[in-house]
Design a protein with these regions (language model features):
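N-terminal secretory signal peptides and thylakoid transit peptides that target proteins
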Residues: 1-17
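Active-site acidic/histidine proton-transfer and metal-coordination neighborhood
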Residues: 13, 19-22, 78, 97-198
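C-terminal segment of N-terminal export signals and the immediately downstream linker at the start
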Residues: 20-39, 47
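Acidic (Asp/Glu)-rich catalytic clusters
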Residues: 23-25, 43-50, 65-85, 111-118, ...
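Hydrophobic faces of well-ordered beta-strands that scaffold small-molecule active sites
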Residues: 28-33, 56-58, 83-88, 122-124, ...
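Acidic-and-aromatic substrate-binding clefts and catalytic sites of carbohydrate-active enzymes
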Residues: 34-42, 58-69, 91-95, 130-132, ...
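Conserved, mostly hydrophobic/aromatic
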Residues: 48, 56, 76, 103, ...
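Acidic/histidine-rich catalytic cores of soluble enzymes
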Residues: 86, 155-257, 299, 305-306
Length: 306
């Protein structure tokens, strides 16, 4: 055995402790839709990077187009742009049994696609019993029937695909389960699948004046209770339109009251680089405005981007 002097040993220990004391820069992944007309995976990936994005929505591709799936995965990996999510926006609780079966099959296929392309998740809402608006309110959306049916749907989707990489996630909605972190925890425990994960959409969960005004506390509560399961997040903002009843309206990040300082700090603390994805804006200019605002808040907090 080689001799190690006391001085060398002490130097190593000091160096190790010093290394522990160094704080790694906080970084998050950030993205949004792009408006490129190209269908080429390489060009699409580079356009995300040109816009300063390190995360993307999955480009259009069919589950049976294996060549394009591989091309997308490889092109985006080369640019260090992760595919944050595959949207699976269908009503899993449609009152029409035929539509419900078709929607379940569609969402199952979207999870399979997410797994094949290397996306972080496939995401949907739990659905609604509303017969007219697929995501609309209904008195039974907080019922035991709704909860049990959602658990069954999530299990069916995950068990059919058996994903190796992607997760299946349900978004919060203000008028359906889960509408907050506690209902989300109940859902996680009931589904009882490792492939079931959390998709944070802060604005979707703000369904009262109290949550609107105390949204920083709501954000921190969501991450404190759900952080270990978070795989992706949505970015937008809310303003209160003054009427004779409560009316919140989605706006460009920075124009509303969402506490992005709290949001970005909680994201940066996660053990994984869960992407933050802007959505629901109308034009490239609005997305650019929202991105500038989010980056300015991050810069003030010392948070960087991949």
């Amino acid at each position: 055995m080689a001799h190690v002097s006391r001085r060398t040993l002490l130097s190593s220990v000091v160096g190790f402790r010093s290394g522990l004391a160094v704080t790694r820069p906080k970084r998050i992944r950030f993205g949004g839709p792009i408006f490129s007309k190209s269908n080429d995976p390489g060009e699409l990936a580079r356009e995300h990077r040109r816009l300063g994005y390190s995360a993307a929505y999955c480009p259009p591709v069919e589950i049976n187009d294996r060549e394009r799936i591989r091309a997308i995965e490889q092109a985006f990996a080369r640019e260090n742009v992760v595919i944050a999510e595959v949207g699976a926006w269908r009503n899993l609780l449609d009152p029409d049994p035929e539509k419900r079966r078709a929607n379940l099959a569609y969402v199952t296929e979207r999870l399979a696609l997410a797994d094949e392309v290397g996306a972080r998740c496939a995401v949907d809402i739990a659905g609604s019993f509303n017969p007219d608006v697929w995501y609309g309110p209904h008195p039974k959306n907080f019922s035991r029937e709704f909860f049990d049916a959602t658990v069954d749907n999530c299990r069916r989707i995950i068990d059919a695909v058996k994903p190796r990489r992607a997760k299946f996630a349900i978004e919060m909605m203000g008028w359906a389960i889960p509408s907050g972190p506690d209902e989300y925890l109940q859902l996680i425990r009931a589904v009882d699948r490792k492939a079931f994960a959390v998709h944070i959409d802060v604005c979707n969960g703000i369904n009262s004046p109290k949550r609107f005004y105390e949204n920083a506390a709501f954000i921190r509560e969501c991450f404190a209770k759900l952080g270990r399961w978070v795989v992706s997040c949505h970015a937008k903002d809310l303003e209160w339109v003054v009427e004779m009843n409560v009316h919140f309206r989605e706006v460009v990040p920075g124009r509303g009251q969402i506490d992005y300082g709290a949001y970005l700090q909680e994201l940066a603390r996660l053990p994984v680089d869960a992407p933050l994805m802007m959505e629901h804006l109308k034009t490239p200019e609005e997305y650019a405005e929202g991105a500038r605002y989010i980056r300015s808040v991050a810069q003030r907090l010392g948070i960087d981007f991949y």
